[in-house]
Structure formats: structure tokens, C-alpha cells
């Protein structure tokens, strides 16, 4: 038997754990691509549903295919009464990611994936239902309202905003949500995606794979960076105060979320896109504090540590300007990244072998058992 290769590096940094045709991350001259398309081009000119179709079905849709796909998703938005009842029983102080996890798992009980031929239809069902799962629980637990889980909004981003606020969203807000969902849709073998692939490699059902991925994203070292960034940004009332506060945090070696990346070395290509849209939202509402504070923190982190903002940092202010509660930031990530998770599940299933690495043992040497009477 060939000697097993011992992997080095905390968190398996730099190790290749498999093959994918879905995305590239951090390659020179590319930054981030989905099936060969630069994410910046997709964010500029595509609908999120086009990107979802690209990831899940393999190619960008034609105009007719996109219209059919959006109609299909529109018909799948409502929630079963039993799921609404479950969501009503979840308290307002529950972690929203727990709500998403429970909603996904319960839907898998009443609308199961009977075999793998249903994988795309079940993914489309989750893609259509996730905004309603999040908003139905939030509006019921916080406002006491049983909302209509359907809307005439053609896009998932517009539908989410409509359910959350109970009214038709502005064109600018719909555009920004569309861009945000595209930017978060896929990102190679990140922790939650790899979790989904490990689960898929056992030939488990789609709902189990997605539920496992949600559980992984719930951890603060993976999801939640935009929430933590928002909480930090809101502490400061001016750019000057932000600079002083950031320097103090660096001196105390506090963790500052929203900066740096495990793969990108010089910049996160998603950041430049969402920063521009955050600025447009700031101008729309006449903001004179939040965006300048964000820029002050950004500049200080670069000057002091040469750390660049990742996709999460300016997402915080963008979501805030659209009236989205901070606690819902990471569940939005779920609504988007579902497309990447599911595409990886499909890919794993298509050429599967159970993922079962070995561990390097670092414990005590083999020893003789001593009966309890002699210990």
C-alpha cells in the first residue's frame, strides 16, 4: 500500500480536496468565476435567476428559458400550512439560522426527495421557499403577522424584500438584492459547501446536505461576518471616531470581521461591486455617517495591516440601507448560496466516492489494558 500523504497547514489551507467545474476562486486574472463567467460581469448584467440556472443546469438560459424558470419559481413560493405552524412555534429570540435549518429539514419531511432524479426540482422548491421561510417566521415572531408568502415580484430578491417589508420594493433595492445574491451564490470548497459535499458523498438526500451546510454556515468563522461588521460600524458616529476605535481594536488584538480572506491575497473581487452599490444606497437615503465610517475603517485596516475588505464588509451597510434587520443578514446568504451548495451536491453525486480522509494520529503509543481492579 502506498504511504498516505500527510497534509500540513491549519484548516487544510492550500490543499486540493477534489475537482469542480463550478467556480474558480483567487486565480490570477480571474478572481471569481462561475462556470467560466467573471462574477463582476454577471453582477453587472445578469439576473440572479440566470446565475442560479447557470449553476444548477449548466449553461446560461435563453430569454424564454429564463422566463419559464422565473414562472416556475414563482409558483413554488408558498409554504405548506404544516411548515407555517412549525415556524409560528419558533420564538423570536431564536437564531435565524436555526430557523432556516429547521425550515429546510421540516420541508424535507413533507416534500421528500424520493430519488436523485428529483434533485433539481427539489432545489428549485427550496430556492423559491427560503425567502418565505425566513420572512414568515420573522414577521410572525416579531410583528404577530401571518404574511402572504406569495407576491407578484418576478425576482427572488424583490420577492424577499416584498415579504419582509410588506410592500413593493424600489427598483434600486431590487437591483442591489439581485447583485448581492449573485455575489454570494458560489465560492468553491468553502466550509459549508464542503460539508454539503461530504454529506452528499454518503448518498444522503438533498435536504440533509443543505441542512448540514446551513449548520456549517451558522458558525461565526464562516457566516455572520456581515452581521459582526454591522454591529461594529454602528458603534461609531463619525469617521474620526471610527479611526480611533479601529486603532484601539487593533492594539487590543480584537477580531475585526469583514477583512482579509483565506484564498484571496490582494483583494476580493466581490467587494468592489457591493461597495459601489452601498454608496448608491447611501446617497439615496442621504447618509452622512454609516458609509463614511465604513470607508474610514476600510482605510485604517489597509494602512495598519494591509488587510482588504471582503464581500461581507460593505454588504453590511448595503443591507442596512435597505431596512434589513441585522439578524437576517446571514439567512440571506443561505438564500443565495443554496445554488452553489446544490450544484456541488449534483456534481458529487455524478462522480461519487464517499469522502473519507485519514487522520495523522498524535496520541499516546499503544499500551496494555489494565483491569479496573488494578487501577
Question: Model-predicted segments: where are they?
Answer:
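Non-transmembrane, aqueous-exposed alpha-helical and coiled segments at domain scale
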Residues: 1-375
